[in-house]
Amino acid sequence: MAHMVRASSGLSYPERFYAAASYVGLDGSQSSVKQLSSKFSNDTSLLLYTLHQQATLGPCSIPKPSAWNPVEQSKWKSWQGLGTMPSIEAMRLFVKILEEADPGWYPRTSNSVLDPAVHVQINSTKAEPSFESGASFGETKTITSEDGRLTETQDKDVVLEDPDTVSVYNQWTAPRTSGQPPKARYQHGAAVIQDKMYMYGGNHNGRYLGDLHVLDLKNWTWSRVETKVVTGSQETSSPAKLTHCAGHSLIPWDNQLLSIGGHTKDPSESMPVMVFDLHCCSWSILKTYGKPPISRGGQSVTLVGKSLVIFGGQDAKRSLLNDLHILDLDTMTWEEIDAVGSPPTPRSDHAAAVHAERYLLIFGGGSHATCFDDLHVLDLQTMEWSRHTQQGDAPTPRAGHAGVTIGENWYIVGGGDNKSGASKTVVLNMSTLAWSVVTSVQEHVPLASEGLSLVVSSYNGEDIVVAFGGYNGHYNNEVNVLKPSHKSSLKSKIMGASAVPDSFSAVNNATTRDIESEIKVEGKADRIITTLKSEKEEVEASLNKEKIQTLQLKEELAEIDTRNTELYKELQSVRNQLAAEQSRCFKLEVEVAELRQKLQTMETLQKELELLQRQRAVASEQAATMNAKRQSSGGVWGWLAGTPPPKT
């Protein structure tokens, strides 16, 4: 679901946004808001409304509505919460949310908003006779769109053939199939066991599927497998109890099918591993040990020897991942890998392959807004990520593509890049990292879809690549086959040229050109390897220096920690001494205060003493004066009394 928007049409922004807004009925009127609420849930309607406002009017600048109008206040808060989000980002999120809520919206839009480059027109005439696979004679195919209308598409790049006539090299052919084909879908899983392609799950109209179908690659006959679910010792024949999922990985292992991860309606905390027993036709949950990865979908799962290597994906909260996990199929134990180097940025819907049972290659994928065309290599022995220069005709950025390996060649088909489907089928020589184009189709055909499946099998003794399903504006359930001319066996063809069958004569010229190109590439391989070795030695030397510096820094840090501990102890000692001094100072201040109080009392007493002394002096003077007066007055009275004066 994360990248469904890439395959919805050939329209670019802002036309795609206006087409989506026209579909949901947002024209700015109040009736359009009511129409929106009638189509989607309240949360989805509110989010679409606010993103439309942000895309068309910019950041919210209107005053906050009254609390008496909770609906308008809720709209205002949601719009205000978008802040200064750019208009083009709001448009992209608007279309993305619409795709998740209504994946089939694009085919139901009016013809006036469709991209004219798609060449889809209403077929008002009677549909051409068709076979059980849904493909018709000639160059015109009749396809039923999501709204039940019939459309015609011109597909000159896919040749419709009988099963026994798939003999053209490097060109896609559509074999006529029999039996009841599966429902159209994308993001399903497919795997081959004993010349039979098993197809499980997927996404149709936003609904996860849980059915299992098998295509016999010998007679091209479809049949549905009635499955049962085993829970402990209890069995049930009801397939509905099996978890429906999309974006999972289907891996063949020991005559069994392993279904790993995938998006579900009620996701679990950890990534589940389901196993399907071909003999009992039963699903069961595989018991694993260790710490499993968190639940996710859109990841890559690669079988390397007896281990599964899981990278990236998108969790249940739609957060992108770039973590690495390995499941040992012997011990059923999970291990999370902390690889060195620069890993790929978080992504989902990428492709992965293993080369020489040692190197894991990751190509493309997408984030919420960007598709990638980068190629990353993980050395599974040293667990080190690296990036190398790609040679040849490098593919365009894409996500939702599929890939298979034949020998040292990695074939990549489909995917999208936010504008259109990837129409070129490309191949990477994993030894030289050189790209080349195998063939090309028109952008509107099912092979230029997102979420298709790709498997490799053999037919009449030769390798074939089988593609099924996908989504490019409508869901597909077509089967297409490619018989590649292998570059991995060029040397044997050169040495045994006389033994080449006559049936190869039609492609001798193309094979010769491939040989010349391969020789040139091999001539550059030694120089590239020498350069890479030199760069690796330089990186290792630089890494050793960094390790030495790291050790030195660790030692210095340890010394600093020790010194810091000592200083802290000294600080604590000083603090204790300071506390003691502060206590002593406080006591001294109390004593000084008491002495000052006593001194003030002594000064008062001194003043009182001086006052008493002055009063005493005055009293003495007064007494002396009085005595003198008495003496003088006593002489007169004595004379009068006849008393003689005292002798002197």
Swiss-Prot record:
GO biological process: lipid transport; response to hypoxia; response to light stimulus
Organ and tissue specificity: Expressed in roots, stems, leaves, flowers and siliques.
Annotated localization: Cytoplasm
Compositionally skewed regions (Polar residues) per UniProt: 625-634
Induction: Up-regulated in the light and down-regulated in constant darkness.
UniProt region (Disordered), positions on chain: 625-648
PROSITE patterns in the record: ACB_2
Effect of L46Q: Reduction of oleoyl-CoA-binding activity
Pfam families, per the entry: ACBP (PF00887), ACBP4_C (PF24922), Kelch_KLHDC2_KLHL20_DRC7 (PF24681)
UniProt-listed Gene3D superfamilies: 1.20.80.10, Kelch-type beta propeller (2.120.10.80)
GO terms, molecular function: fatty-acyl-CoA binding
Similarity comment: family membership: Belongs to the ACBP family.
Name this polypeptide is given: Acyl-CoA-binding domain-containing protein 5
Organism: Arabidopsis thaliana (Mouse-ear cress)
Lineage of producing organism: Eukaryota, Viridiplantae, Streptophyta, Embryophyta, Tracheophyta
